[in-house]
């Protein structure tokens, strides 16, 4: 590992998408006295196992504006970020029509290119021009974002780390933060680790699903004004179909957009047995990094008390929070619901550990705010990987510029009652 400094103006905790992005932009703006600390390594957390989808499709106006900014950052260097700008499709039933129309209209208002197809017949025709084997029922709207797409998770993080180092930032892995030292005013003056102490002027916490641990270290409130718990965990469900990535191409042989479908049509397995008659959703894409068709479904909430949830070991190494046969059956059946080519493909599901935990806020949307005078917390509520541009905005705020894009995500919204609107999607982050 690189030597741990005894002091640094900026100490960033977490070498994932937010920590590395913040380090890069701070250093690029002339603030080179910055160190990123990670207990394991670059991309060892949620960013490193992310499916990699980059989209603007959000019902919440503040999220759309923020994501439009992040897409621009992805587009700034596709090669370094291993970014594939293939576009994104939100495919929906009638119950979501009003939401989708609103998203489309507001995307137009901010200059984000997309196309809206409405009506069951027109939607079916549109999809069959891309995939002749398209057969999903109950679809009444298709929102086709021409920008967005997906990136290869670990490759993009390595590219981001390279940019941060080239700009002058220091990245030290294998260091576990154990405590914060505060002065009498409550300002953090140093960060204690298992390898020594680092005095600092600013701390940035970009720890993904581990954010609660640092929140507790800082003795911040366990509940918000409404009485709801500040944190809760959801288990993420993703997997890979063991077929060549080219198995899922458009009829013309090119890569398709990332597909996300929500449906209220009852879903059955290949034997005709009903899986669910409630709202369901999946997303999927051909992926040469995963070497198959990769995607996922809606996560499920972990209902035990948050203090009893064990984050480590994380992701595929977890003995508990990995996908099982129920996910495989549901996801593969949903793929078959959409395309004839996936009929009978459950046997091709890749049986390997997959999954992870996301740490969610009370309203399932991020908190970007300063606490304890000089601690900036990036709590992404599992929206993180796609938000490559947040680090740029945070770096600007740390240097004294207030960000209009980050303002709707302050912690004070819970006391003020200015939380974000809720959509009809089955996904907590939509």
Task: Label each PLM-derived region with a short phrase.
Residues 3-18, 35:
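Beta1/beta-strand and adjacent pyrophosphate-binding region of the FAD-binding site
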Residues 18, 42, 210:
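Conserved Rossmann-like nucleotide-cofactor binding loop
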Residues 24-28, 54, 79-87, 198, ...:
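Active-site substrate-recognition segment that forms the wall
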Residues 27-47:
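Glycine-rich FAD pyrophosphate-binding loop
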Residues 51-130, 139, 279-282:
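Dinucleotide-binding Rossmann-like beta1-alpha1 core, especially the glycine-rich loop
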Residues 65-66, 91-99, 143-163, 322-330, ...:
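Short beta-strand to alpha-helix junction loop
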Residues 143-202, 206-213:
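Helical element adjacent to the flavin cofactor pocket in flavoenzyme catalytic cores
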Residues 322-430:
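C-terminal catalytic lobe of FAD-dependent flavoproteins
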């Amino acid at each position: 590992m690189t030597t741990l400094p005894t002091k640094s103006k900026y100490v960033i905790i977490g070498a994932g998408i937010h920590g590395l992005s913040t380090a890069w932009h701070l250093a690029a703006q002339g603030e080179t006295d910055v160190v990123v600390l990670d207990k394991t390594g670059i991309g060892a957390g949620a960013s490193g196992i992310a499916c990699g989808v980059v989209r603007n499709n959000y019902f919440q106006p503040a999220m759309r504006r923020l994501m439009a900014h992040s897409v621009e950052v992805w587009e700034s260097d596709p090669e370094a970020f291993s970014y594939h700008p293939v576009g994104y499709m939100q495919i929906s039933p009638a119950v979501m029509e009003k939401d989708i129309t609103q998203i489309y209209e507001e995307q137009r208002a901010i200059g984000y290119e997309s196309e809206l197809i409405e009506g069951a017949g027109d939607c079916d025709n549109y999809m069959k021009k891309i995939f002749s084997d398209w057969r999903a029922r109950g679809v009444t709207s298709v929102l086709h974002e021409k920008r967005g797409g997906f990136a290869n998770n670990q490759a993009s993080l390595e590219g981001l780390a390279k940019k941060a180092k080239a700009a002058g930032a220091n990245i030290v892995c294998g260091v576990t933060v154990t405590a914060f030292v505060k002065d009498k005013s409550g300002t953090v003056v140093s960060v204690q680790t298992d390898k020594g102490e680092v005095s600092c002027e600013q701390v940035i916490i970009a720890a993904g699903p581990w954010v609660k641990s640092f929140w507790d270290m800082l003795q911040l409130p366990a509940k918000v004004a409404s009485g709801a718990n500040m944190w809760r965990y959801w288990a993420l469900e993703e997997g890979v179909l063991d077929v060549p990535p080219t198995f899922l191409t458009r009829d013309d042989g090119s890569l398709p957009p990332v597909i996300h479908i929500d449906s209220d049509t009852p879903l059955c397995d290949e034997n005709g047995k009903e899986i669910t008659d409630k709202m369901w959703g999946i997303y999927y894409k051909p992926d040469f990094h995963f070497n198959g068709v990769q995607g996922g479904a809606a996560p499920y909430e972990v209902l035990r008390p948050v203090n009893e949830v064990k984050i480590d070991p994380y992701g595929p190494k977890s003995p508990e929070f990995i996908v099982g046969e129920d996910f495989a059956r549901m996801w593969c059946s949903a793929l078959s619901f959409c395309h004839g080519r996936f009929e009978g493909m459950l046997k091709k599901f890749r049986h390997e550990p997959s999954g992870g935990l996301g740490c969610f806020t009370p309203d399932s949307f991020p908190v970007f705010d300063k606490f304890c005078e000089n601690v900036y917390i990036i709590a992404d509520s599992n929206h993180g990987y796609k938000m490559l541009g947040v680090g740029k905005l945070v770096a600007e705020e740390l240097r004294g510029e207030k960000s209009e894009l980050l303002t709707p995500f302050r912690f004070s919204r819970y006391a003020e009652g200015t939380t974000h609107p809720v959509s009809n999607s089955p996904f907590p982050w939509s």
